[in-house]
Amino acid sequence: MNNFLKRPIAHRGLFDNINIVENTLASFNNAIDNDYAIELDVVMSKDHEAVVFHDYDLKRLANKNLQIKDLTSQELRDILLLDTDSSIPTLDEVLYAVNGKTPLMIEIKSGNHPFIEERLTEILKSYDGPVCVKSFDINTVKWFKINAPFIKYGLIGSDL
């Protein structure tokens, strides 16, 4: 875990939500350029792709009353965020762009897909950079402990 503690962590990338939108390739490249580690969020699309987005819907960042789980990764890629040229990347695209240049902390939003853990394991087992997964869902964290102990994992806590 030392790789994750050596530098500040850019939560959802390094962004201002004006010119650079959170959880986009632009925000992650900005974090890398400024020597930050990256925290990002993953949800599943209709076609079972792991896409990088914090919310379960598009209301806040695209002003659309649509659910992520109801759209394919291509449909999501075609939606521009906050009047910029940025769209919702897949986790594969982010891993390719980051390419081990900085540590990644992946928050799993497990509420929208029952097999998100399996899909993330498939994707992450071939990634060579420093990476860990985390979740508020203890069952998700237990799943990684039992089924993918080679991936670092952690539980996120909150006030009751």
Tell me the role of every PLM-derived stretch:
Residues 1-160:
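Phosphate-group recognition and catalysis centered on beta-loop-alpha active-site segments
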